[in-house]
Amino acid sequence: MATQLDYYAILEVSRTATADELKKSYRKLAMKYHPDRNPGDDAAEAKFKEINQAYDILKDEQKRAAYDQYGHAAFEGGGPGPGGFDFGGGFGGGGLGDIFEQMFGDMMGGRRGGRARTGNDIQTHVEITLEEAFSGVKKDVRVITRVACEACHGTGSDDGASGVEVCPSCHGAGKVRAQQGFFVVERPCPTCHGAGKVVKNPCKVCHGEGTVEKERTVEVQIPAGVEDGTRIRLSGEGEAGGNGVPPGDLYIHVSVTEHGIFQRDGANIYCRVPLRMAQAALGTEIEVPVIDGSRTKVKIPAGTQTGAHFRLRGKGFSVLRSTARGDMYIQVTVETPQNLSKRQRELLEEFEKEAGEDVKQSPEHTGFFRRVRDFFEGKE
């Protein structure tokens, strides 16, 4: 039996890692080993699959708890399989939900319907720019997944649909009941692994699975206003289930790259603009870029200080599922001149001599040093 790697080791985190630490490490590793960044590298592709499998378990609190207690045995048999756990729909497939349902089902008005089985979900990653997050963008995402076998049309049998029969053990239910102490619990059928069907004369291409591994490209529409770390779900774009089972879902984790000019905070966007000392003192009009590619002019009043903000309404990001928009803020930094010429130094020295202790010209400076003087005088 092949050695199964520890999921925490795969994600390079400790067993006490928080959800945020898991997500951060997952995104970093997914970007590093993504097939698009490592074309033709089978080792990177295998590593990428391991990373997604590990994160799929550890990001779910219930699955993580089961893994911490039972290790890989908690998910043996295809998850859910014989002896494994299925956490969908609230402890389905032999969990606490079935125990309490057996005890109280009749009093509660009968049993609930079983959750429909589907193929496995897929986790992948896409990186976009801040401009693309602002405007929205279509991206082609490459995924390596299992698709319906063309040779048997997904039935798993060389005989097609006629070669698939109702499971004789569970009679098509996909589950069997077993006595555990005082309780009767349901588990996935060990004969058909929960499919409710068995294959006669297995397909020689897919060996009765009904699915084969294949790389395909999926187009995803990333909406305007999407934030870094957003997860987009594409229903039915996951792995095919085989034997007529519906496909799972595709989850795309969006990463927004840092920008050289703009910083985002929610729906608002910030742009830091340096001003020369004379511009800040005398006042000026500057032209600044906007995230949509346009430019706009901003009037800077005389006497502007470092840290001053100027607000441009409606120039920020759109808010998802809303008509609202954020604002853009220009943050001013007054730059002290360096490498002065002799003439510039003389002018500044003359300016300093002229300004002196004029409170009106330098209220913060004058007030601060007055407080310092009072502080030391109080010590004497």
UniProtKB/Swiss-Prot annotation:
Zn(2+) 2 binds at residues 167, 170, 189, 192. It is found in: Cytoplasm. A zinc finger (CR-type) spans 136-215. Its main location: cytoplasm. GO terms for cellular component: cytoplasm. InterPro entries: DnaJ, DnaJ_C, DnaJ_domain, DnaJ_domain_CS, HSP40/DnaJ_pept-bd, HSP_DnaJ_Cys-rich_dom, HSP_DnaJ_Cys-rich_dom_sf, J_dom_sf. Keywords: Chaperone, Cytoplasm, DNA replication, Metal-binding, Repeat, Stress response, Zinc, Zinc-finger. CXXCXGXG motif repeats lie at residues 149-156, 167-174, 189-196, 203-210. The keyword Zinc applies. GO terms for molecular function: ATP binding; heat shock protein binding; unfolded protein binding; zinc ion binding. Pfam families: DnaJ (PF00226), DnaJ_C (PF01556), DnaJ_CXXCXGXG (PF00684). One of its GO terms (biological process) is protein refolding. Coiled coil: none annotated. The keyword Zinc-finger applies. Binds 2 Zn(2+) ions per monomer. Residues 6-71 form the J domain. Zn(2+) 1 binds at residues 149, 152, 203, 206. The J domain is necessary and sufficient to stimulate DnaK ATPase activity. Zinc center 1 plays an important role in the autonomous, DnaK-independent chaperone activity of DnaJ. Zinc center 2 is essential for interaction with DnaK and for DnaJ activity. Belongs to the DnaJ family. Homodimer. Participates actively in the response to hyperosmotic and heat shock by preventing the aggregation of stress-denatured proteins and by disaggregating proteins, also in an autonomous, DnaK-independent fashion. Unfolded proteins bind initially to DnaJ; upon interaction with the DnaJ-bound protein, DnaK hydrolyzes its bound ATP, resulting in the formation of a stable complex. GrpE releases ADP from DnaK; ATP binding to DnaK triggers the release of the substrate protein, thus completing the reaction cycle. This is Chaperone protein DnaJ. It comes from Acetobacter pasteurianus (strain NBRC 105184 / IFO 3283-01). The gene is dnaJ.
